[in-house]
Amino acid sequence: MTSEPGVAPGDSFFAGRNQVDDWRKVLLYDAAAEAGVLAALPASPAVMAHRLGLDQRAVRILLDALAVWDVVVAGQDGSYGPGPAMPGDDDEAVLRHHGRAIRNWSRVIDDRLRGAPVAPPAPQPGPGRAQWLDALAVFARRWAPTLADACLARFPDATSALDLGGGHGEYALELVRRGLRVTMQDRLEVTVLAQVDGRMADAGVEVFAGDFFGQLPDRAFDLVLLANVAHTYDATHNIELYRRILPLIAVGGGLAITAFVRDRDPRSAIFALQMLSGTGGGDAHTEHDYARWLHEAGFSTCAAMDLDGQPQSLVLARP
């Protein structure tokens, strides 16, 4: 998709200041994709409106606007087709995730400022949950090698790992490529989606379905990875989770936490809005917060480091 100067489409949601995709393009693209308009290309607005049960005038106006960014092109016969800037699968996943964030922020941040609690999340339909996982997987594929390098530099003798809250499975797959035996745990509805394409089974990743506040594997691991999970919880839940993880760490092993840490990268302060809008206590917690919580949970050492090119930081801890 055509981007503003300095903007990479795949960075739109986690971009720095003044580097984000045009909000108009993001919302228009997401609306067109959600309504099935893009999947119906090539066709005329009249044909698409009839086929999809949409308003013909609205379809035409939306397509004309998308043509400004070369997402679609108009033909001489009044039909529209995919344009040179039509995004590929990865960019589409990121743009749609970004679009949902814009709508969510505009709807709920005002409520949060006035102290209204976060409403319990409605059950996310299969397609919506899959789109969310797809967007997270785009970033994870980009960041996983750097994360694995850092974890194995700190725990070089690790031969087994638990990817806790592993979702899309990209980190688990990268650790398998490094020669580790890996178990990935997440909620049942997430693990079902993570296994659809068969990559987890082909790689030999063991999948453990369950809420990690209720059930964890009954054996120890050299490395426990908690990637992009801790910032979704408040202090109480973080401490409880670390206490539950502590017995799972084998002698000589440790815990690796990736999170948006507020005092280490300015993008984390922006990401905290996502936590404000969608969680009851999530935040871009500080490095001091993590050190204090880990110590209270029984860990003896804790150190934070930046990951090259990533907005998240890595917090490493040993029992």
Where are these regions (language model features)?
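N-terminal accessory segments
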Residues: M1-D111, A116-V118
